[in-house]
A protein has these predicted regions:
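Nucleotidyltransferase catalytic core that binds NTPs
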Residues: 1-211, 219-223, 251
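Charged, cofactor-coupling segments
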Residues: 245-254
Length: 254
């Protein structure tokens, strides 16, 4: 959606690897109104168009596709793409309609650009899983490549929304990574109770006075359904507010 940063640079780098010497890399930028719920930050979401364009040029992008809203959506639109299982939990529960917007715009972008490969970051793990399911179910002939979460030096996952954080919020937001690592360490030393693990993650996040937890969940990484026992390929996912800024992060317990 723009406001590009070093995590996007990593996506571009991986895309270039898969494109090879004779392939081309396309980047789409579109602040999608369908994936913002009422009262959210759609109007405030950063749109540094010139900076993003220069970013793509310096990164060696061959095509920057930046459509206007009226080019993608008719005023009387009545057709949407909606995944019916993975999108009902985690972010889907907290942000109803969000993934209908994501699937609709991604399907449209796939139809317009017709890529062989598309690259998505694991920070938005649920989005990645839903896009993969959509590609499978709708027979898109596109390979979906997952890229590990890119982080700042202090562990905070890179996000365009990080720039909303004031100094104290930014400092305390590093607790998310610490809490997730706490959960991973517990699993690694034999903890099997999802309740105890998520409780420890919550307690760690609670050490940051400005943190307000939306959810802390242990889920199966394939189905995204909550589980009661820690097992291979479990995922700890968190969503936490710092002031008005909502951040998400996760860690795979492999």
């Amino acid at each position: 959606m723009g406001a590009l940063h070093k995590a996007h640079l990593e996506l571009i780098r991986i895309a270039r690897q898969h494109a090879g010497k004779h392939g081309e890399v396309a980047v789409s930028i579109f602040v999608n109104p369908l994936q913002f719920e009422p009262g959210s930050d759609y109007e405030q979401y950063p749109r540094p168009e010139k900076t993003d364009e220069e970013f793509c040029r310096n990164a060696g992008v061959n095509l920057l596709f930046r459509p206007a809203g009226e080019e993608l959506y008719f005023k009387d639109r009545s057709t949407y793409v909606e995944e019916g299982s993975l999108s009902k939990v985690l972010e889907g529960k907290s942000r109803p309609g969000h993934f209908r917007g994501v699937c609709t715009v991604v399907a449209k972008l796939f139809n317009i650009v017709v890529p062989d490969t598309a690259v998505f970051g694991e920070k938005d793990f649920q989005q990645l899983a839903i896009v993969r399911r959509m590609v499978r179910d709708l027979n898109f002939k596109i390979d979906i490549i997952a890229v590990p979460t890119v982080r700042e030096e202090d562990g905070l996952a890179c996000s365009s929304r990080n720039q909303y954080l004031i100094a104290d919020e930014r400092k305390q937001a590093t607790i998310l990574r610490k809490a997730l690592l706490k959960g991973a360490n517990m699993a690694g030393t034999g903890e099997t109770s999802a309740a105890r693990l998520t409780s420890a993650v919550r307690e760690t996040i609670g050490q940051a006075p400005l943190a307000r937890i939306d959810y802390v969940e242990l889920v199966d990484a394939q189905t995204l359904q909550p589980i009661e026992v820690v097992r291979q390929n479990s995922l700890v996912a968190v969503a936490v507010f710092f002031g008005k800024t909502r951040l998400i992060d996760n860690i795979l317990l492999s």
